Amino acid sequence: MKKLFAALALAAVVAPVWAATQTVTLSVPGMTCASCPITVKHALSKVEGVSKTDVSFDKRQAVVTFDDAKTNVQKLTKATEDAGYPSSLKR
């Protein structure tokens, strides 16, 4: 039992080391006016773990920097979809 507790405690301490900041580009083709990026940026900024967003109307994309221990691409695309702007990972 003590070994199990020690292993769990070690994992809890080391886990944050595995987390990394990631930057992804999302394609957001539904942005049709100059004010759409404001809504998309607001939706993405509310996602826990997002540290930076750069939304471009001209390119119809959002560049998002986030902590992958707190969120993931699926949560980002869900946030834009819930705001009325479906998005997908741009490759």
From Swiss-Prot:
Residues the record lists as binding Hg(2+): C33, C36
Domain HMA stretches: 22-88
CDD domains xref list: HMA
Main localisation: periplasm
Keywords: Mercuric resistance, Mercury, Metal-binding, Periplasm, Plasmid, Signal
InterPro entries noted in UniProt: Heavy-metal-associated_CS, HMA_dom, HMA_dom_sf, MerP, MerP/CopZ
Signal sequence annotation: 1-19
Disulfide bonds, paired cysteine numbers: none
Pfam families reported for this sequence: HMA
UniProt keyword Ribonucleoprotein, yes or no: no
GO terms, molecular function: mercury ion binding; mercury ion transmembrane transporter activity
GO cellular component terms, A-Z: periplasmic space
Subcellular location: Periplasm
Family under the similarity heading: Belongs to the MerP family.
Function: Involved in mercury resistance. Acts as a mercury scavenger that specifically binds to a mercuric ion in the periplasm and probably passes it to the cytoplasmic mercuric reductase MerA via the mercuric transport protein MerT.
Subunit structure: Monomer.
Protein name: Mercuric transport protein periplasmic component
UniProt organism field: Salmonella typhi
High-level lineage: Bacteria, Pseudomonadati, Pseudomonadota, Gammaproteobacteria, Enterobacterales
